[in-house]
Each structure stands twice: as C-alpha cells, then as structure tokens.
Amino acid sequence: MDQDIHDQLAGHLSVMGMGMPHREGLVEILKENFTEQEAQIALMLPTTNTPLKPVTIEALSGSSTLDRNFLADTLEYLAQRGLIYSGKTESGEVGYALHQAGFGFPQAFFWKGEDSPHARKMTKMVLKYFNREVTKEAFGGKKTKAYRYIPINRSLNPEVQAVLPHDQMDTVLDNATRFAVAHCPCRVEAGLMGRPCEHPLEVCLKFDEMADYLIDHGLGKEITREEARVIVRKAAEIGEGVAQHSRDQAQAARNHGG
C-alpha cells in the first residue's frame, strides 16, 4: 500500500469547506490515529458535503473492491473512536462523513474529558499543529465562519441591541429536539497541559444530529432541554459568551469565558 497514504488523507481533509490546512503536523496526527487501511477507507468519504451530511455504505461500496461488511465495520469502528462522523441520511440510513474543522476535529479527541496517555499525546500534537498560522487559515480565512457568538436571551437590552430571534439561545434551545453535553475541548486540553480551568468542564452543548452522534458513540451524555438552559444560564452568570455553529439549524453551542 502507498506509504504516503496519510499525506494523501491530509490533502483530502484540506479541501473541505471547513478543511484542515495541509501540514506535516496533520499528517502526524493522522498516522497516530489511522492505520493505512483505515486511511485508505477514509479517503473514500467525499470532501464536497457540508458538515454532518453523511453518505451511505451503498454509495461508498459501489466504487470500492472492499467487502461491503468489512467497509461498514471499519467505518463504524472509526466513528466509535470519534475519528469520523456517523449519522442518519435523509433516507434514514446510517451514513458516514469526514470531520471538518470545528465540527469534530480536533474536538472529538477531548469530548469525553478523559485523562489518558492517548489524550495527553493528542493534546501535544494538536497544540503543535494548530499554531497561529494554521488556526488563522482554518478558521479565519474562510467567508463562512465555523462559529459565531450569540447572546443569551435575558442579557439583551432591546433598546441598544437588535438581534434576530434565531440569534437568541432560548430560541435555539426551543427549536432543538435532542440535547447532549460534552467536555469543553479547550478546557480539557488546558488541564492535560497542567493548566486546569477554574470553570466547569461539561459545557459543550450539542443539538439534534450532532447530539445523536455524541450520545450514540459515548462521546457525550444526553440531557434535557431544561438542563441545557441551566448550563447556558450558569455561563451567563459568570460572564461567558456562547459560540454557535454557523448552520441554518444550530447543532452546537460552546460556552466561552476569559
């Protein structure tokens, strides 16, 4: 098998809408997490889909000589490890997609909040890869931003602020149907580097399809709408903002503070 398969996968990941800049650091992260066979299979996943839009096994197996069951088992194994996204397609079938920057990469390494040798190694590798240049290219060099900060409803002053209804967290929560909470990747990384955050760790909210993914794969835990409101309210009380994914239907909110 081609010995540069991980470099090929890094290039594949770099051309997505919210892709990861192609650097040696990314190649090293991929080598640490994907076997050559797994990298070859990940290369089959399209780069043109928007985040959280999976493709079926049938669609993938049509262009592959691999056994269909082996392909399905490998993709599910990668999803269980948080290396790719898994969810339902519009037809209701199970499908898979690549993680995109800010939509699972590198967050999935830390959502569980584990302190393990692998988590510590990933912390060092991720921080080395996401230097200032790479971070700017991944998140600041695109017309469509992965995140935006939105106000918490009761903190609004309508006399001085004009905010559309969908920009209010209460509305986001009202419109969602399933809720999950995971550990904040930034705070987990800080703790693993010996700089523990004084704020709560389980504050990364996920909704609907993304909530399904985290709950089904053990990356986060299911909560109620009211429990999500409590997390948002507590964030407001300590002066944190809420970052929302830029999607027509919100999938995640992350509480951030100084």
Roles of regions detected by a PLM:
Residues 50-64:
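Short acidic, hydrophobic short linear motifs in intrinsically disordered regions
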Residues 92-133:
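Short, amphipathic alpha-helical interaction segments positioned at domain boundaries
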Residues 79-90:
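A short, conserved structural fragment
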Residues 130-258:
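Catalytic cores of enzyme domains
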Residues 34-39:
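Short helix-coil-helix linker/hinge
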Residues 42-43:
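Hydrophobic residues on short alpha-helical segments
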Residues 1-28:
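Long, low-complexity, charged/polar intrinsically disordered regions in eukaryotic proteins
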Residues 64-80:
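Short amphipathic alpha-helical interaction segments
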